[in-house]
UniProtKB/Swiss-Prot annotation:
A motif (SCOOP motif) lies at residues 41-55. Residues 42-117 are annotated as: Disordered. This is Serine rich endogenous peptide 5. The keyword Oxidoreductase does not apply. Residues 42-51 have a biased composition (Basic residues). GO terms for molecular function: LRR domain binding; receptor serine/threonine kinase binding. It comes from Arabidopsis thaliana (Mouse-ear cress).
Amino acid sequence: MATKTSNFVSLRVSLFILLLFISSQVAIADAKHLQQLRRKLQIVRRSRSQRGRQYNPPTLRVPPPPPPPLPQMPSAATPPPMPQLSPLQPKMHVSSLQPQMLYPPPSLPYASSPTST
Protein backbone atom coordinates (compact mmCIF):
# COMPACT_ATOMS: atom_id res chain seq x y z
CA MET A 1 0.00 0.00 0.00
CA ALA A 2 2.89 2.34 0.77
CA THR A 3 4.37 1.89 -2.73
CA LYS A 4 1.05 2.76 -4.35
CA THR A 5 0.83 5.97 -2.33
CA SER A 6 4.43 6.93 -3.07
CA ASN A 7 3.90 6.23 -6.79
CA PHE A 8 0.74 8.33 -6.71
CA VAL A 9 2.53 11.18 -4.93
CA SER A 10 5.48 11.09 -7.35
CA LEU A 11 3.05 11.07 -10.27
CA ARG A 12 1.25 14.13 -8.88
CA VAL A 13 4.55 15.94 -8.27
CA SER A 14 5.80 15.23 -11.81
CA LEU A 15 2.46 16.38 -13.27
CA PHE A 16 2.67 19.57 -11.20
CA ILE A 17 6.20 20.25 -12.47
CA LEU A 18 5.05 19.60 -16.03
CA LEU A 19 2.12 21.98 -15.56
CA LEU A 20 4.48 24.69 -14.24
CA PHE A 21 6.79 24.24 -17.23
CA ILE A 22 3.93 24.45 -19.74
CA SER A 23 2.44 27.53 -18.08
CA SER A 24 5.83 29.28 -18.11
CA GLN A 25 6.19 28.55 -21.84
CA VAL A 26 2.71 29.95 -22.46
CA ALA A 27 3.58 33.05 -20.45
CA ILE A 28 6.75 33.56 -22.50
CA ALA A 29 4.81 33.19 -25.75
CA ASP A 30 2.18 35.66 -24.51
CA ALA A 31 4.88 38.16 -23.57
CA LYS A 32 6.44 37.91 -27.04
CA HIS A 33 3.04 38.36 -28.68
CA LEU A 34 2.29 41.33 -26.43
CA GLN A 35 5.62 42.93 -27.37
CA GLN A 36 4.81 42.52 -31.08
CA LEU A 37 1.43 44.16 -30.54
CA ARG A 38 3.09 47.09 -28.74
CA ARG A 39 5.50 47.58 -31.66
CA LYS A 40 2.63 47.58 -34.15
CA LEU A 41 0.72 50.10 -32.03
CA GLN A 42 3.76 52.41 -31.90
CA ILE A 43 4.07 52.22 -35.70
CA VAL A 44 0.39 53.09 -36.11
CA ARG A 45 0.71 56.02 -33.67
CA ARG A 46 3.74 57.35 -35.59
CA SER A 47 1.93 57.12 -38.92
CA ARG A 48 -1.14 58.92 -37.50
CA SER A 49 1.02 61.73 -36.18
CA GLN A 50 2.38 62.31 -39.70
CA ARG A 51 -1.03 62.93 -41.30
CA GLY A 52 0.11 66.24 -42.75
CA ARG A 53 2.35 64.44 -45.19
CA GLN A 54 0.96 63.65 -48.62
CA TYR A 55 0.23 60.03 -49.44
CA ASN A 56 2.41 58.67 -52.20
CA PRO A 57 1.07 55.40 -53.61
CA PRO A 58 3.67 52.78 -54.39
CA THR A 59 5.03 53.02 -57.91
CA LEU A 60 4.51 50.13 -60.25
CA ARG A 61 7.65 48.66 -61.69
CA VAL A 62 7.44 48.08 -65.40
CA PRO A 63 9.23 44.88 -66.37
CA PRO A 64 12.09 45.41 -68.84
CA PRO A 65 11.46 44.32 -72.42
CA PRO A 66 12.54 40.78 -73.20
CA PRO A 67 15.99 40.42 -74.76
CA PRO A 68 16.11 40.02 -78.54
CA PRO A 69 16.16 36.42 -79.69
CA LEU A 70 19.60 34.96 -80.23
CA PRO A 71 20.51 33.82 -83.74
CA GLN A 72 19.81 30.16 -84.21
CA MET A 73 23.06 28.24 -84.35
CA PRO A 74 23.08 24.59 -85.39
CA SER A 75 23.52 22.44 -82.36
CA ALA A 76 26.58 20.27 -81.94
CA ALA A 77 24.41 17.14 -81.83
CA THR A 78 23.26 17.53 -85.45
CA PRO A 79 25.95 17.22 -88.15
CA PRO A 80 26.10 19.88 -90.86
CA PRO A 81 24.16 19.04 -94.01
CA MET A 82 26.02 17.09 -96.70
CA PRO A 83 26.81 19.04 -99.88
CA GLN A 84 24.86 17.82 -102.85
CA LEU A 85 26.98 16.11 -105.50
CA SER A 86 26.15 16.84 -109.08
CA PRO A 87 25.11 13.84 -111.19
CA LEU A 88 28.33 14.19 -113.21
CA GLN A 89 30.52 13.37 -110.20
CA PRO A 90 30.77 9.69 -109.27
CA LYS A 91 29.41 8.70 -105.87
CA MET A 92 32.13 7.47 -103.55
CA HIS A 93 31.83 4.57 -101.12
CA VAL A 94 32.46 5.86 -97.61
CA SER A 95 34.01 3.47 -95.12
CA SER A 96 33.58 4.04 -91.41
CA LEU A 97 37.35 3.60 -90.92
CA GLN A 98 38.45 6.14 -93.53
CA PRO A 99 37.79 9.88 -93.40
CA GLN A 100 34.81 10.99 -95.39
CA MET A 101 35.75 12.16 -98.88
CA LEU A 102 33.39 14.61 -100.55
CA TYR A 103 35.15 14.71 -103.92
CA PRO A 104 37.15 12.09 -105.84
CA PRO A 105 40.91 12.27 -105.23
CA PRO A 106 43.05 13.86 -107.93
CA SER A 107 44.47 11.40 -110.40
CA LEU A 108 47.86 10.34 -109.13
CA PRO A 109 49.75 9.43 -112.33
CA TYR A 110 49.53 12.97 -113.68
CA ALA A 111 50.41 14.58 -110.38
CA SER A 112 53.44 12.40 -109.69
CA SER A 113 54.77 12.30 -113.24
CA PRO A 114 58.03 14.29 -113.59
CA THR A 115 57.48 14.71 -117.34
CA SER A 116 54.07 16.36 -117.05
CA THR A 117 55.53 19.90 -117.11
